[in-house]
């Protein structure tokens, strides 16, 4: 999905809509080659995340094996990534196996707009975490910047309820990284530490500043999660 669709607030700026001369196909192909090269460099840098990705998959497999569930949320393109992930868990990834409990909190437009209208868009995920999350569950938050207020609120609600929070993050990690590292609660009041999960959170920050490359890395990490969760719960295929 186009990076502008991710409403983290710091995505690529909208370009001018003034008419432009169409480029020759050879020049367009060269642009595509440059994108492949850029994506390859980003993916190579992401190898440094392997241990964190493995630890996150282990935490999710442990939760599922113990009767827990995976909650997922994100905005825009990251919401689509969340739907992708929950769908792979509920149905299957590469093998036929029993369905796994996963809920994407960005899927129910009636609930989201109700909360946004009656209270605040900042609370659209947090209230669902409060209602659905139980100690031992895992919340996966997906953001390209770490600065979306509703993601911060969701992570804070998860910590308070005793859920493990796994962040697929980007850029410098933003305020979310600070909260997960320092144990804050996302509302600026350090008096309520919101540390009910015992410090089990995992913050996976995709390298680079390009929103598009960050989203591509997130998609591959999601596939790695699916592969590793299936491996732990069901063995080699």
Each language-model region and where it sits:
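Generic N-terminal amphipathic, Lys/Arg-enriched alpha-helix
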Residues: 1-6, 12-48
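Flexible, glycine/charged-enriched surface loops at secondary-structure junctions
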Residues: 49-55, 99, 235-237
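Structured helix-beta-strand junction loops
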Residues: 66-67, 135
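A short, well-structured juxtamembrane/interface segment
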Residues: 45-66
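Hydrophobic beta-strand scaffold residues
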Residues: 70-71, 165
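Glycine-rich phosphate-binding loops that contact phosphosugars or nucleotide phosphates
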Residues: 78-235
């Amino acid at each position: 999905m186009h990076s502008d669709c991710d409403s983290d607030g710091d995505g690529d700026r909208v370009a001018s809509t003034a008419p432009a001369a169409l480029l020759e196909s050879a020049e367009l192909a060269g642009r595509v080659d440059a994108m492949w090269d850029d994506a390859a460099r980003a993916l190579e840098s992401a190898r440094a995340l392997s241990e964190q990705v493995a630890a996150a998959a282990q935490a999710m497999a442990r939760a599922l094996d113990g009767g827990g569930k995976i909650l997922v949320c994100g905005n825009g393109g990251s919401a689509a990534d969340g739907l992708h992930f929950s769908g792979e868990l509920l149905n299957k990834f590469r093998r036929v196996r029993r369905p796994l409990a996963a809920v994407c909190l960005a899927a129910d437009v009636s609930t989201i707009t109700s909360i946004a209208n009656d209270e605040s868009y900042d609370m659209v995920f947090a209230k669902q975490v409060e209602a659905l999350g139980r100690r031992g569950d895992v919340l996966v938050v997906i953001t390209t910047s770490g600065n979306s207020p509703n993601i911060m609120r969701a992570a804070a609600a998860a910590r308070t309820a005793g859920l493990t929070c796994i962040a697929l993050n980007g850029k410098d990690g933003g305020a979310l990284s600070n909260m997960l590292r320092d144990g804050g609660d996302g509302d600026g009041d350090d008096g309520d530490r919101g540390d009910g999960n015992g410090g089990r959170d995992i913050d996976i920050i995709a390298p680079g500043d390009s929103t598009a490359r960050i989203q591509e890395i997130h998609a591959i990490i999601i596939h790695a999660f699916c592969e590793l969760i299936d491996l732990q719960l069901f063995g080699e295929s």
